[in-house]
Amino acid sequence: MSRILQSTTIACAILIMTASAAAQESPAVGVAAPAFRLQDQTGKWHALDDYRGRWVVLYFYPKDNTPGCTTQACEFRDNIFAYRELGAVILGVSVDDVESHKAFAEEQNLPFPILADSAKKVTAAYGTLTRYMGVVELARRDTFIIDPQGRVASHFVKVEPKGHSAMVLTELRQLAAKTTPATTN
């Protein structure tokens, strides 16, 4: 019995250490967002620098065509015009490949880039790489709002998919209002 308990304890410790090893800290609010260059569902390359001067909603999600990820993506899709009115671009990121993203974007009629981070470098740089069941590496469901100067303006951690886009939109409106100079007549 004690041997089973000891083996279980060791196995749990290894899983915890393994999960911790994959973890990297997310960039803090106010610091420069980590640079990236990734392909979208059409094969087009996107770099963070391409969006300098615009607000960027960079959302990480675990897996294409899963219930929560589909809900999250479709809510961003349904609010796309509100984001565009604020001059914001939406970029989704997961560790799935370009082909998986292509099928997902087509099936859900997504009007924004879904970036393939198959090498998991960007997901790790943003501190969202996590291990599911201690084995499979996926992106944690986090969202970053990046300001027009390329700094992290807000970070949502381990979000619930339902209603998340509305929360991001509210935060983005508040941030944009603070940085837009008031006009007087």
Locate predicted features.
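Bacterial N-terminal signal peptides that target proteins for export
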Residues: 1-9
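N-proximal helix/coil linker or "cap" segments that precede and/or mark the start of modular domains
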Residues: 14-35, 180-183
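A short beta-strand-turn-helix
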Residues: 27, 36-55
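Short loop/turn microsegments at loop-to-beta-strand junctions
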Residues: 33-34, 55, 140-142
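Short active-site neighborhood of thiol/selenol oxidoreductases, capturing the structured segment around
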Residues: 49-70
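Structural microenvironment flanking redox-active thiols in thiol-disulfide oxidoreductases
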Residues: 65-110, 118-122
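Thiol-/selenol-based redox modules, centered on thioredoxin-like
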Residues: 138-185
